[in-house]
């Protein structure tokens, strides 16, 4: 089974760059406090790194 990470949105997407909003939607995050579980792949890690200041990651 693939390793997974939990990603939680901690800050609002209002007033952010359109590509940051798109990245959050790509991760499946829709609102503050929303948590999703994703596979720990380089693609997902890259998306998290792009919006690191708006999310919290748990291994």
Curated annotation (Swiss-Prot):
InterPro entries noted in UniProt: Ribo_uL30_ferredoxin-like_sf, Ribosomal_uL30_bac-type, Ribosomal_uL30_CS, Ribosomal_uL30_ferredoxin-like
Disulfide bonds: none
Key words, A-Z: Ribonucleoprotein, Ribosomal protein
GO molecular function: structural constituent of ribosome
Gene3D superfamilies given in the database record: Ribosomal protein L30, ferredoxin-like fold domain
Pfam family, one: Ribosomal_L30
One GO location term (cellular component): cytosolic large ribosomal subunit
Example of a GO biological process term: translation
Keyword Nuclease: no
Subunit structure: Part of the 50S ribosomal subunit.
Annotated NCBIfam families: rpmD_bact
Family: Belongs to the universal ribosomal protein uL30 family.
Name by which UniProt lists this protein: Large ribosomal subunit protein uL30
